[in-house]
């Protein structure tokens, strides 16, 4: 039996020029999040997911996306190997540690190899830009914390 696989390329056309940004993306999902930025999601199998944020002149990538706020261009991501949750401004590499998952209180989390999966389902930014960081296991809340302005100032 053959399995249907869908591959495509992401092409940016700006100022009359075509630029292929991503080749052979497997089963992409593309969402326009504002006038200038697209969010492209590509799965390579559980738990492997790639998240690309593509603007007219810049792009950003993360494998462990928890949440993002397009108004402040703030990305919340985890690094499961380093056991950290970071905030960073989109299109920069300046990361700010929000949570150290190696602290004993986080031993309750079920995931040990992909922490983002514990946080990504319920974590969100509210309409004031405050991050509600929530870890859950099948609907049971294991950890909850509100973080104001997780990426720092609103300037880029």
Q: Which residues does each predicted region cover?
A:
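Beta-propeller folds
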Residues: 22-50
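Surface-exposed loop/turn elements that mediate protein-protein interactions on large endomembrane-trafficking
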Residues: 2-22, 45-65, 86-112, 138-156
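Short beta-strand elements that form the blades of beta-propeller/WD-repeat-like
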Residues: 1-5, 34-45, 71-88, 118-137, ...
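Repeated scaffold domains used in trafficking and secretory/extracellular systems
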Residues: 22-31, 62-79, 107-123
């Amino acid at each position: 039996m053959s399995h249907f696989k869908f591959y495509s390329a992401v092409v940016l056309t700006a100022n009359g020029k075509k630029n292929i940004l991503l080749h052979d993306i497997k089963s992409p999902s593309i969402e326009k999040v504002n006038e200038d930025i697209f969010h492209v999601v590509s799965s390579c199998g559980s738990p492997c997911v790639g998240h690309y944020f593509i603007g007219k002149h810049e792009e950003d990538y993360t494998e462990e996306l928890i949440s993002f706020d397009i108004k402040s261009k703030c990305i919340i991501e985890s690094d499961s190997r380093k056991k950290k949750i970071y905030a960073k401004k989109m299109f920069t590499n300046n990361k700010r540690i929000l949570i150290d998952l190696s602290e004993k209180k986080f031993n309750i989390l079920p995931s040990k190899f992909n922490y983002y999966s514990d946080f990504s389902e319920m974590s969100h930014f509210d309409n004031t830009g405050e991050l509600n960081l929530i870890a859950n296991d099948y609907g049971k809340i294991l950890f909850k914390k509100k973080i104001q302005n997780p990426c720092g100032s609103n300037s880029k």
